[in-house]
Curated annotation (Swiss-Prot):
<dbReference type="GO" id="GO:0008270">
    <property type="term" value="F:zinc ion binding"/>
</dbReference>
<keyword id="KW-0479">Metal-binding</keyword>
<dbReference type="InterPro" id="IPR009080">
    <property type="entry name" value="tRNAsynth_Ia_anticodon-bd"/>
</dbReference>
<feature type="binding site">
    <location>
        <position position="236"/>
    </location>
    <ligand>
        <name>Zn(2+)</name>
    </ligand>
</feature>
<keyword id="KW-0648">Protein biosynthesis</keyword>
<feature type="short sequence motif" description="'HIGH' region">
    <location>
        <begin position="29"/>
        <end position="39"/>
    </location>
</feature>
<keyword id="KW-0862">Zinc</keyword>
<feature type="short sequence motif" description="'KMSKS' region">
    <location>
        <begin position="264"/>
        <end position="268"/>
    </location>
</feature>
<dbReference type="GO" id="GO:0005829">
    <property type="term" value="C:cytosol"/>
</dbReference>
<keyword id="KW-0436">Ligase</keyword>
<protein>
    <recommendedName>
        <fullName>Cysteine--tRNA ligase</fullName>
        <ecNumber>6.1.1.16</ecNumber>
    </recommendedName>
</protein>
<dbReference type="Pfam" id="PF09190">
    <property type="entry name" value="DALR_2"/>
</dbReference>
<comment type="subunit">
    <text>Monomer.</text>
</comment>
<keyword id="KW-0030">Aminoacyl-tRNA synthetase</keyword>
<dbReference type="GO" id="GO:0005524">
    <property type="term" value="F:ATP binding"/>
</dbReference>
<dbReference type="GO" id="GO:0006423">
    <property type="term" value="P:cysteinyl-tRNA aminoacylation"/>
</dbReference>
<feature type="binding site">
    <location>
        <position position="232"/>
    </location>
    <ligand>
        <name>Zn(2+)</name>
    </ligand>
</feature>
Length: 466
């Protein structure tokens, strides 16, 4: 299995620290609001990668943190006249609702920064003792010049970073690129006692500490969105390797942006949709199919048209599943026949192709294409003359290849059928109201989803295109 390592900028063979196990740390949300669908892409991508590792037999220790103390959280809590903890509790609860809605598996652990304050303070103290950090009037800064490899993840050296830095001048810093790992107490902010006075941690130190506490000095994979490469992950590396003297993570993985009109979706640009808003309009499997239709390192444009296309694709896949489910009641032969054995080998080749695509840096786009090729083959060659065993194997294979992607796992077609019936009722009403444009639109939309309507004297009938 090969994956692209941001650190080396190339694909590398994955070799875990411990055979059969993967330790994985993914930077989670700052819990001051609902997460937008751009963040959702990141969480969904690494959920899929975790699922695929498990499909290939690995035990995955998957850690995703909650940043529950932060400038944005303090500002929002003060605006609402509640405590930062109350705000964090609320939006952690809302995070789980939306992540569950996207069919994202629960992490092995979701540490909260505020639960690790003793460990964070010790981490800061160790950096000061080793000469990598210094205290000024209750603030503690990491000295980037002391860490000779600073910039290695983002591919920049310290001189270039300083030249291009847009950093406000702070006379207390020894160097403009030094960053705060502890911030002194300010009015209206939560604070904790420490040897250099009351205060709170900086964002970067929180992740370094939680990753170390839960996964050890060196972890297999550290991951997050592409926007975290610099400064967040760069600073994590500096802190962790300065303190522990060991490689922090063997592989760094980053997912590309979800764009709107070719611009990164972000709260700062106010060009975002919350995950909850999208879940109100689309099923989780449709969203997953859309998100995974592009490679995780490729920017993806977000649009209703693309989601509608994913919805139609999802229904075509479920049409195939529905056809196979019906065939189970119609076939007359139980066991695979001699003539079918060669065809079973043909079906098995799709699984091999799927694994080949996913083993190549988790190429979900190509893996989904393999599933569609498999379904087309099955639709063409399996019918009432096939054996029950072959139909069952075909059905199991489609679902098996869908599982690591978090799709094609629904047990029945009932929900889909009910939706189709509802649309037909709406079309009938439109015809009664002589709203021919709406009636034609519903018919055309259904046709695009593989559903053909037949107007008969007995009423409207529908069938799925083969």
């Amino acid at each position: 299995m090969k994956l692209f390592n941001t650190m080396t900028r190339q694909k590398e063979e994955f070799k875990p620290i411990k055979d059969g196990e993967v330790s994985m740390y993914v930077c989670g949300p700052t819990v001051y609001n609902y997460f937008h669908i751009g963040n959702g892409r990141t969480f969904l991508v690494f959920d899929t990668i975790r699922r695929y590792f498990e499909y290939r037999g690995y035990k995955v220790n998957f850690i995703q943190n909650f940043t529950d103390i932060d400038d944005k959280m303090i500002k929002k809590a003060n605006e609402e006249n509640i405590t930062v903890k109350e705000l964090g509790d609320r939006f952690i609860h809302e995070y789980y609702k939306d992540a569950d809605g996207l069919n994202i598996k629960r992490a092995t652990a979701n540490p909260r920064a505020t639960e690790y304050m003793d460990e964070i303070i010790q981490f800061v103290k160790d950096l000061i003792d080793k000469g990598y950090a210094y205290e000024v009037n209750g603030d503690v800064y990491f000295s980037t010049k002391q860490f000779k490899e600073y910039g290695k993840l983002s591919g920049q050296n310290l001189d270039d970073l300083q030249a291009g830095a847009r950093i406000s001048v702070d006379e207390r810093k020894k160097d403009p690129m030094d960053f705060a790992i502890w911030k002194s107490e300010k009015p209206g902010e939560p604070s904790w006692n420490c040897p250099w006075g009351k205060g709170r941690p900086g964002w970067h130190i929180e992740c370094s500490c939680m990753a170390h506490k839960l996964l050890g000095d060196t972890i297999d994979i550290h991951a997050g969105g592409a926007d975290l490469v610099f400064p967040h992950h760069e600073n994590e590396i500096a802190q962790s390797e300065a303190r522990n003297g060991k490689t922090f993570a063997n592989y760094w993985m980053h997912s590309a942006y979800l764009n709107i009109n070719n611009k990164k979706m972000s709260k700062s640009l106010n060009n975002f949709f919350t995950t909850r808003e999208i879940l109100e309009k689309y099923d989780a499997e449709v969203i997953r199919l859309f998100m995974l239709s592009a490679h995780y390192r490729t920017p993806l444009n977000f649009s209703d048209d693309l989601l509608q296309s994913a919805k139609a694709s999802n229904e075509r896949l479920y049409n195939a599943i529905g056809n196979l489910e019906r065939l189970l009641d119609e076939v007359k032969v139980d066991k695979v026949t001699e003539n079918e054995k060669e065809y079973v080998k043909n079906l098995e080749s799709y699984k091999e192709k799927y694994i080949e695509k996913m083993d190549d840096d988790f190429n979900t786009a190509d893996a989904i294409s393999v599933i569609f090729d498999l379904v087309k083959d099955i639709n063409t060659n399996i019918n009432t003359e096939s054996s029950k065993e072959l139909v069952e194997y075909s059905l199991e294979l489609i679902r098996e290849l869908g599982k690591p992607l978090g799709i094609l796992q629904k047990s029945t077609m009932l929900d889909l059928n009910a939706e189709i019936e509802k649309l037909i009722e709406q079309r009938q009403q439109a015809r009664k109201d002589k709203d021919w444009a709406l009636a034609d639109k519903i018919r055309d939309d259904l046709k695009a989803r593989g559903i053909v309507l037949e107007d008969t004297p007995q009423g409207v009938r529908w069938k799925r295109e083969q």
